[in-house]
């Protein structure tokens, strides 16, 4: 695939970028060079190569999935104006 001057102008218009005629011509060459590099990458044989999620080996550290109350009840109700046994006390609004 190659990029021509018309394609560069169309992309610039779609991106709402003002591009001068000489810049568009320069970008045509740059985009063709980039696409040439991508085509080279497509030619590389990667059969048998396992896909990677990172360039460095990483292990997910796992913890036991244990349900707890968090032991934060006192911290949670500490700033409440009224509490009773770690519950918020609120005025009655429905009769």
Curated annotation (Swiss-Prot):
Supply the EC number(s): 6.3.5.-
Molecular-function GO terms, alphabetical: asparaginyl-tRNA synthase (glutamine-hydrolyzing) activity; ATP binding; glutaminyl-tRNA synthase (glutamine-hydrolyzing) activity
EC primary class: ligase
Reaction catalyzed: L-glutamyl-tRNA(Gln) + L-glutamine + ATP + H2O = L-glutaminyl-tRNA(Gln) + L-glutamate + ADP + phosphate + H(+); L-aspartyl-tRNA(Asn) + L-glutamine + ATP + H2O = L-asparaginyl-tRNA(Asn) + L-glutamate + ADP + phosphate + 2 H(+)
What the entry lists under Pfam families is as follows: GatC (PF02686)
Question: Which SUPFAM superfamilies does the entry link to?
Answer: Glu-tRNAGln amidotransferase C subunit
Q: Which GO terms describe its biological process?
A: glutaminyl-tRNAGln biosynthesis via transamidation; regulation of translational fidelity; translation
Which keywords belong to this entry? ATP-binding, Ligase, Nucleotide-binding, Protein biosynthesis
Cross-referenced HAMAP family, in alphabetical order? GatC (MF_00122)
The record's section on PANTHER family has: GLUTAMYL-TRNA(GLN) AMIDOTRANSFERASE SUBUNIT C, MITOCHONDRIAL
Q: How does it assemble?
A: Heterotrimer of A, B and C subunits.
> What does the UniProt function comment say about this protein?
Allows the formation of correctly charged Asn-tRNA(Asn) or Gln-tRNA(Gln) through the transamidation of misacylated Asp-tRNA(Asn) or Glu-tRNA(Gln) in organisms which lack either or both of asparaginyl-tRNA or glutaminyl-tRNA synthetases. The reaction takes place in the presence of glutamine and ATP through an activated phospho-Asp-tRNA(Asn) or phospho-Glu-tRNA(Gln).
What protein family does this chain belong to? Belongs to the GatC family.
Tell me what this protein is called: Glutamyl-tRNA(Gln) amidotransferase subunit C
Whose protein is this, by species?
Answer: Mesorhizobium japonicum (strain LMG 29417 / CECT 9101 / MAFF 303099) (Mesorhizobium loti (strain MAFF 303099))
